[in-house]
C-alpha cells in the first residue's frame, strides 16, 4: 500500500528534477536564441568579460548589466535584479556579501557602508548543484543574476494545457498480477529574452 501511494510523488519529484536540469543545461550550453545570437553575448550586454567568484564588485557588475538593459527601441527598462543563481560552494559567500553591513573600501576607509546590504531582503540566493554537475569537474562554473520577470523574462517553462504535475493512470492487465502505470508530463523550455539574466563565467571551485 505504501508503494502505491508513494509512486505519484516519486515521479513528480523526478519530473521536476529533470525540468530543473534542462533549465540549467540551457544556461551552461548558452545556445543561440531567437535573434541568432547566443543567449549570453556581448551583443546582448548580459555577459561579464572575465570570470570570477561572487564578490561585492562582481555582483554589482552583474546587477548593472540588468539595470542598463534597453527595450528594442533603445529605451531604458532598468530590469530589477531579483535572483542570484550560484553553484554549490558560493552560498556562504553570498551570505557574507549581502549580510555584512560595514566593509573596508580602498580609498574610502574602514567601516564603510556596504552598498549591497540594502539588497539582503531583495535578492534571493539560489544555490544549485546542477550547475556544478553540468559544468564538469575542474571547469569554471558560471553564476547568474536574474531579474524580476515583471521587467524582463529569461527562461520560461511551459506545460501542455497548464498541467504542471505528471498525469498518472493505473490499470490492471487481465491474467497478470499487479498494476500497470502510465505516467506522463509534457513541457517545453524556451529562452524568451536575454534582457532578464546576466552571466559571470565564474571560476573553478
Task: Give residue ranges: language-model regions.
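A glycine-rich phosphate-binding loop feature that marks nucleotide/adenosyl-phosphate handling sites
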Residues: 29-33, 80-87
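Sequence/fold signature of self-assembling virion shell proteins
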Residues: 42-53, 57-68, 82-83, 89-205
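Short gly/pro-enriched beta-turn/loop segments at secondary-structure junctions
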Residues: 72, 77-81
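Alpha-helical scaffold segments that mediate packing/assembly in large oligomeric complexes
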Residues: 1-6, 10-70, 122
Amino acid at each position: 500500500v505504501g508503494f502505491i501511494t508513494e509512486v505519484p510523488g516519486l515521479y513528480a519529484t523526478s519530473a521536476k528534477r529533470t525540468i530543473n536540469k534542462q533549465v540549467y543545461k540551457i544556461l551552461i550550453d548558452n545556445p543561440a536564441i531567437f535573434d541568432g545570437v547566443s543567449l549570453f553575448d556581448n551583443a546582448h550586454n548580459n555577459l561579464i568579460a572575465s570570470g570570477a567568484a561572487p564578490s561585492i564588485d562582481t555582483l554589482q557588475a552583474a546587477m548593472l548589466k540588468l539595470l542598463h538593459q534597453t527595450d528594442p527601441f533603445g529605451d531604458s527598462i532598468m530590469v530589477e535584479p531579483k535572483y542570484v543563481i550560484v553553484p554549490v560552494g558560493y552560498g556562504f559567500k553570498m551570505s557574507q556579501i549581502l549580510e555584512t553591513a560595514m566593509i573596508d573600501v580602498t580609498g574610502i576607509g574602514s567601516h564603510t557602508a556596504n552598498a549591497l546590504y540594502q539588497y539582503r531582503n531583495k535578492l534571493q540566493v539560489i544555490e544549485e548543484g546542477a550547475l556544478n554537475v553540468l559544468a564538469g569537474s575542474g571547469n569554471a562554473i558560471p553564476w547568474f543574476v536574474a531579474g524580476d520577470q515583471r521587467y524582463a523574462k529569461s527562461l520560461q517553462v511551459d506545460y501542455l494545457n497548464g498541467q504542471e504535475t505528471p498525469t498518472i493512470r493505473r490499470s490492471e492487465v487481465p491474467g497478470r498480477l499487479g498494476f500497470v502505470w502510465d505516467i506522463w508530463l509534457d513541457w517545453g523550455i524556451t529562452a524568451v529574452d536575454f534582457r532578464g539574466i546576466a552571466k559571470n563565467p565564474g571560476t573553478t571551485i
